[in-house]
Amino acid sequence: MTPEILPIEQYDDQLAEKTERLRGMMAPFNAPEPVVFRSPVSHYRMRAEFRIWHEGDELYHIMFDQQTKQRIRVDRFPAASELINRLMPELLAAIQPDSVLRRKLFQIDYLSTLSGEVIVSLLYHRALDEEWQEHARALRDSLTAQGFRLQLIGRATKTKICLDRDYVDECLPVAGRDMIYRQVENSFTQPNAAINIQMLEWALDATAGSTGDLLELYCGNGNFSLALARNFERVLATEIAKPSVAAAQYNIAANQIENVQIIRMAAEEFTQAMQGVRQFNRLQGIDLTSYQCETIFVDPPRSGLDDETVKLVQAYPRILYISCNPETLSHNLQTLSETHDIRRLALFDQFPYTHHMECGVLLEKRQ
């Protein structure tokens, strides 16, 4: 696989290999057969980052080969959305003749949406002044005139300049309802929008007919908690990153959802609060004891759940666990399977043509 050529003809074989690998990893836990969700074979990534190479008067996107560390020129990138592919040549064509915009530009980040918006972040090894802003505004205006709905951001050491705003609003069709999600530049968002929709719909199906409330740890911009809110009386969700919490609060209002409460704290802190070990000012006005959380949802980082959080999670009758690293999931399941059975297993091909796997399990406590 090169950045410009995807081995599309190998997609089915690669997905079959991942499915087999997941089966093997989940076999010790008596997991059911995985339901497999395919990715689009191209234009599936909603974001991309490129280094910028300067050669004489020319300017082009590059990536580095992970094995050889050689640089590879990238003029088109079929893994990324069609919107990013349309924008890449137009953006460089506009920057190339402009000495102010190109000077010490070393990286460009793209974040696009299915709703047709895109954020472009230009990263520099120099201070950005008023002259840069003037040229950047002209660049934004010329690309807008070409039909691109874009936000332009300049970054340098300890500097972030937004010409307008640093977010885009995504709209995802989820089980018959359009969900609005504000996505903030440089914050985590699911990279594969088509797979994200399938993950949300799978989670909705897995929790259909639920009783009581839902607790979610690591909620990000509310991706799962807002979609799942329709299946529960109330949802209590935690997140540590300030921009994500702000986006989640906006998303609650934009989707007119009234049964979701977001708390800004780490999962480890929340564990202490639930156990009564510590009191937090941030929890004033929130009566944790009033929540009847019978289901807990976790979508942890690659490192998985720490031991204390595993113990917290184990107390709940139903656990919905989305994992971007089945190895740490397996490690967590060694403890969780002492008390819970896996009722559902899913493989989401979030990262085609790589060895990475995303999967989901629904666990229920043994009676």
Curated annotation (Swiss-Prot):
S-adenosyl-L-methionine binds at Q190, Y218, N223, E239, D299. Keywords: Methyltransferase, S-adenosyl-L-methionine, Transferase, tRNA processing. The active site is at C324, E358. It catalyses: uridine(54) in tRNA + S-adenosyl-L-methionine = 5-methyluridine(54) in tRNA + S-adenosyl-L-homocysteine + H(+); uridine(341) in tmRNA + S-adenosyl-L-methionine = 5-methyluridine(341) in tmRNA + S-adenosyl-L-homocysteine + H(+). PROSITE patterns: SAM_MT_RNA_M5U, TRMA_1, TRMA_2. GO terms for biological process: tRNA methylation. One of its GO terms (cellular component) is cytosol. Pfam families: tRNA_U5-meth_tr. InterPro entries: MeTrfase_TrmA_AS (IPR030390), MeTrfase_TrmA_CS (IPR030391), SAM-dependent_MTases_sf (IPR029063), TrmA_MeTrfase (IPR011869), U5_MeTrfase_fam (IPR010280). It comes from the Bacteria. GO terms for molecular function: rRNA binding; tRNA (uracil(54)-C5)-methyltransferase activity, S-adenosyl methionine-dependent; tRNA binding. It is an enzyme of class 2 (transferase). Its EC number is 2.1.1.-, 2.1.1.35. Belongs to the class I-like SAM-binding methyltransferase superfamily. RNA M5U methyltransferase family. TrmA subfamily. Dual-specificity methyltransferase that catalyzes the formation of 5-methyluridine at position 54 (m5U54) in all tRNAs, and that of position 341 (m5U341) in tmRNA (transfer-mRNA). This is tRNA/tmRNA (uracil-C(5))-methyltransferase. It comes from Pectobacterium carotovorum subsp. carotovorum (strain PC1).
